[in-house]
A protein has these predicted regions:
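Predominantly extracellular beta-rich ligand-binding scaffolds that present long acidic/polar faces
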Residues: 1-201
């Protein structure tokens, strides 16, 4: 019956939630430029010339860089608040040598020329030329809208607009190094910068 199928789905989701919130955890992010030779988890030399519009977490190359549940692919693991995950795994999540020329717009938070939300992995050697805008939210960047991982050796020449947290490379960044930005930043709120609106480490 339909109700028994719904119960089975609920049980599966509950089991997954217990896996994610238990105390025995370790996820090791091994995303480096050297590991880009391993093609698993790597997007390389890709170019976007199209217009991208979405609700949140919108990017010219990828919307989100994160771990995804098989049970519900639209539910990503929030690595900022979930430090206990009952699995031991290494993660290789790299976007390298990609270029965005297209206009990227999110209706809410997290718009980026390369990725909207980067919660793990590495963005390396990418270029952003298309305008990036967060219409009613925060976190817009020429490369990454919101990054809590590594963004290095990238270049942006674009317009970036957001209420708050707007940057030529990252709206908000964590490890941001060796980047070059010639971006125009606009918006009514706070925390704006040609490289990053703010960094948090």
């Amino acid at each position: 019956t339909i109700s028994s199928q719904i119960n089975n789905i609920g049980s599966t989701v509950n089991d997954t939630a217990q896996l994610v919130t238990s105390d025995d955890s370790h996820i090791e992010d091994i995303s480096t430029a050297e590991n880009a030779k391993n093609t698993d988890g790597v997007i390389t030399k890709s170019v976007n010339r199209g217009t991208v519009y979405g609700d949140l977490n919108v990017g010219g190359i990828t919307g989100t860089m994160n771990i995804e549940y098989d049970v519900d692919p639209e539910y990503d693991l929030d690595l900022r608040s979930s430090t206990n995950v009952k699995l031991r795994s290494t993660v290789n999540d790299i976007v390298i040598y990609c270029v965005n020329y297209g206009e990227v717009t999110s209706r809410k938070d997290c718009a980026g020329g390369i990725t909207g939300l980067q919660e793990l992995g590495l963005i390396y050697g990418c270029e952003g030329y298309g305008s990036v805008k967060s219409e009613t939210g925060d976190y817009a960047g020429g490369i990454a809208g919101n990054s809590v991982s590594s963004v290095s050796d990238n270049y942006s020449l674009c317009n970036v607009e957001s209420d708050s947290y707007a940057g030529g490379i990252c709206g908000q960044g964590y490890t941001v190094k060796n980047n070059v930005s010639i971006a125009t930043i606009s918006g009514d709120g706070e925390k704006k910068g040609v490289i990053a609106g703010t960094t948090d480490s």
